[in-house]
Design a protein with these regions (language model features):
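N-terminal regions that are enriched for targeting/export leaders
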Residues: 2-54, 121, 355-361, 369
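Juxtamembrane "helix-exit" motif on the non-cytosolic side of transmembrane helices
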Residues: 30-39, 177-185, 322-330
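Hydrophobic cores of alpha-helical transmembrane segments in multi-pass inner/ER membrane proteins
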Residues: 53-63, 90-96, 133-144, 197-212, ...
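Membrane-interface transmembrane-helix boundary segments in multi-pass integral membrane proteins
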Residues: 189-195, 262-283, 327-358
Length: 369
């Protein structure tokens, strides 16, 4: 059996992806010269997208360690490889501190304005923001390193049990800091869970896409996926889609019935103009269509059909992040959205290079286990 992960053509492709990603990202950085605000807004979207995929892969892996099942064995090479991309998060975060004043209104708020909300004024300061970011990222790095170790068989479930709690807490708090505080007067008590559900869909869809796509092309030499495993993978993706829809709708319903101006304005900005159409697209393409498609037993058994569903959900994950972040900014949402897509593609080249490097290492390790 031929494993293309170590072939010269595979290495050449990896280098081309990295080169293209770096060039695209550097060209994106040139926007700093004439529109630094738009660049940092776009960069935040790209950072949240790729860091979310990395963290989502980690939570899926921890769930597998706790529950077991052959479905996890199918995705394990890519989930383990995604742990290596967690190491990219501190590097990708580096530009954000330089754009705090352009991203977050609270970073430049006056003392008089801060007096109206003293608790938020204490919490939302640039120094404390960066300290918390270092704590979150530090926890993620330690967790990724522990899960990457090949220790005793019983180690990973224990690490995963504690890791899930750490993950939920750190992602919830980081979602408040990095996204919710873009509009510092707005808040939602389940916002962190919304982001967790989105990250899970993005990471699971990407792992599924890579697994099936390589098998379709005959570039994966591991054992064939059985009908039961295919059904399990489809059902798990369906469950994640339903969970995302449930949490997202619950947040909307709570705010709708609360009918408080400081909460309702967040949805007004995201259901007006072009963002209203984006919201409808998310309802249809992120929930209704995948829900209908994943109800089909035949589709779950069809790798080609599942790659299409996974690709759709990855695109919707990006659109979801865009919808959560960009309406918080004052203007130029069209320009920022286009720039965000450009920077996301560039950052993706670097992310993919690291992932494929980890997959190449992981394959021999899997064969020995």
């Amino acid at each position: 059996m031929n494993d293309s992960h170590t072939s010269p053509s595979y290495e050449s492709l990896r280098r081309r992806i990295l080169t293209a990603g770096v060039i695209i990202l550097v060209l994106g950085f040139l926007v700093l010269v004439f529109d630094s605000r738009a660049f940092f807004e776009a960069y935040l979207v790209a950072f949240l997208f790729w860091s979310g995929i990395s963290l989502g892969g980690m939570i899926i892996l921890m769930i597998f360690h706790l529950t077991g099942g052959k479905w996890g064995g199918v995705l394990r090479p890519y989930l383990h490889a995604s742990l290596g991309t967690v190491l990219l998060i501190p590097l990708l975060f580096l530009p954000i501190p330089f754009g705090l004043s352009q991203l977050y209104a609270w970073a430049t708020v006056s003392a008089e304005a801060a007096a109206h909300s003293p608790h938020k004024a204490i919490y939302l300061t640039p120094t404390f923001f960066l300290i918390r970011a270092m704590v979150y990222i530090g926890f993620w790095l330690v967790l990724a390193l522990l899960l990457s170790r090949r220790g005793e068989a019983g180690d990973h479930p224990k690490i995963s049990a504690v890791g899930l709690v750490i993950y939920m807490l750190t992602v919830s708090f980081s979602s408040v800091d990095w996204i919710m505080s873009l509009e510092r007067h707005w808040y939602s008590t389940i916002y962190g869970v919304v982001l967790v559900s989105a990250q899970g869909i993005g990471a699971f869809s990407l792992a599924l896409l890579l697994t099936y796509r390589l098998r379709i092309r005959g570039e994966d030499s591991t054992e064939e996926i059985g009908p039961k495993e295919k059904a399990d993978l489809g059902n798990l993706l369906l469950m994640l889609v339903i969970f995302w829809a449930y949490i997202t709708f619950s947040q909307f319903l709570i705010i709708y019935y609360g009918n408080l101006p400081e909460e309702a304005t967040w949805y007004v900005a995201r259901t007006s103009g072009v963002w209203g159409w984006v919201a409808l697209a998310l309802v249809f393409f992120h929930f209704i269509l995948p829900f209908i498609l994943l109800l089909s037993r035949a589709r779950k058994q069809n790798p080609f059909g599942m790659t299409r569903v996974a690709s759709l959900l990855i695109a919707m994950y990006f659109l979801d992040i865009l919808w959560l972040v960009v309406p918080s900014f004052d203007a130029q949402s069209g320009w920022v959205s286009i720039l965000a897509l450009w920077v996301t593609i560039g950052m993706g080249g670097i992310w993919t290079f690291v992932l494929t490097h980890r997959v190449r290492i992981q394959r021999p390790m899997e064969s020995l286990s």
